[in-house]
């Protein structure tokens, strides 16, 4: 059995999990509702306050889907109870961000500002002019939006200018040395 796949998923109080046909799993909690169609091959059962995932056989594909299915359900449960958050930092002279309604405007040294609209179910907030906090209940959407923002100006290795995750460490390079 998959080490991750065989672990049961604990359902906290205030969260309901519904498993419909074709493995459509709907999780409702205090922060909202998430639903997702999971691989049909997996068998998802709810027993009391926990959900278990089992696989029909030991083919390589089934083994990989086993852990994936369990993790996706777990991420949905955590999302509707606690939510997810990612923090981005902007470094560089003149690099900054502004928020206006659902529009995030980035000034990143290009000849034009970059405008990004928050996707549905994801919120962005600013802490000062150089910290962006992205939060939501869907881990995939939060991570995707954060990656899209970062891709607008990824950090460069010489001065570290650009947008990076708050936990990310930029490997610096020495610049070229001049003639003597």
Give residue ranges: language-model regions.
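N-terminal intrinsically disordered, cationic/polar leader segments
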Residues: 2-66, 70-147, 151-180
């Amino acid at each position: 059995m998959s080490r991750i796949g065989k672990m049961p998923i604990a359902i906290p109080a205030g969260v309901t999990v519904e498993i419909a046909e074709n493995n459509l799993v709907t999780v409702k909690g205090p922060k909202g509702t998430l639903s997702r169609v999971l691989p049909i091959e997996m068998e998802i059962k709810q027993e009391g306050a926990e959900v278990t995932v089992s696989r029909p056989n030991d083919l390589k594909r089934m083994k990989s889907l086993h852990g994936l299915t369990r993790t996706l359900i777990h991420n949905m449960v955590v999302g509707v109870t606690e939510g997810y958050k990612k923090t981005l930092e902007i470094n560089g002279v003149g690099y900054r961000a502004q928020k206006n309604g659902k529009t995030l405007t980035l000034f990143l040294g290009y000849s034009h500002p970059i405008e990004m609209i928050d996707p549905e179910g994801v919120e962005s907030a600013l802490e000062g002019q150089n910290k962006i906090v992205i939060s939501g209940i869907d881990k995939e959407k939060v991570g995707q939006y954060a990656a899209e923002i970062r891709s607008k100006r990824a950090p460069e290795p010489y001065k570290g200018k650009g947008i990076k995750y708050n936990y990310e460490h930029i490997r610096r390079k020495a610049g070229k040395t001049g003639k003597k």
